[in-house]
Amino acid sequence: MLLYRLGQQPHIASTAGLGGLYSDGRWHEVGTPILYTSEHLSLAKLEVLANAATLPRNYFLLTLEIADHASTQYLEVADLPPGWNGLPYRRETAQLAQSWIQAGTHWLLRVPSIHSPNEYNCLLNPLHPDHAQLRIVSTEPHPFDARLKQ
């Protein structure tokens, strides 16, 4: 199974989830190593564009491969607390993912995108033993079409 991630150098090359150590997110608290990926490149793009005030520049695409049978915990919209998709981030939502990481049972947590709830992002726990099986397929420049932010 392929997963996609967009970001800038030098951070895009790391799969250690170090960004979670420095800032919080919808699915984690500060100090938590976590790697955000998307099941589709188009969703990865949507996630970046939704959080960018201007057209992202100097972005790279990281394509990852994991086994189709990778241990995964699934969350659907019905499993999430009211307001899970609002701002500021809900503490309850981050706590769901914190519990997943602390349990250490599953390598991936598959969560709905707030921008397209019928599509999914996959969060990877870099502390899980299966993370050693993660394979980098490619890292390549990925420019955004100027028409996406006018």
Mark where each language-model region is.
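Active-site and NAD+-binding cores of ADP-ribose-processing enzymes
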Residues: 2-16, 27-30, 55-150
